[in-house]
Amino acid sequence: MIRLLIADDEALERETLADIVARRFEHEVTIETAENGRKAADTAVLWGADLILMDIEMPGMNGLDAARAVLEQRPECKVIFVTAYSLFQYAHEAMHLGACDYLLKPVKDRKSTRLNSSH
């Protein structure tokens, strides 16, 4: 069973992503959520997340810093950034951190099939 963490400060985004993933991978995934970068980093490390769907702009600690903190302790964890920011700078930094993918919001149900190939 894959442990998936969805980190986004927007409750509707967290719920939508969780719903899409749960419908597509019902018996293959356990889902946890986090509403900010600090909680995402802590949850990912303590819970042992296998995969994180991470927003970039979140209060307190942004998603890039949260991913960096997680990957320092759990380098086997996979990170996919899901963000509204299409700036090359963000995508470049995300890939430099070792992100598996960089998806732009809104995420459509058809894009969730990419999650299966990312893990």
Question: Where on the chain are the PLM-derived regions?
Answer:
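Short hydrophobic/Thr-rich beta-strand motif most characteristic of the beta2 strand and flanking loop
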Residues: 25-35, 43, 91
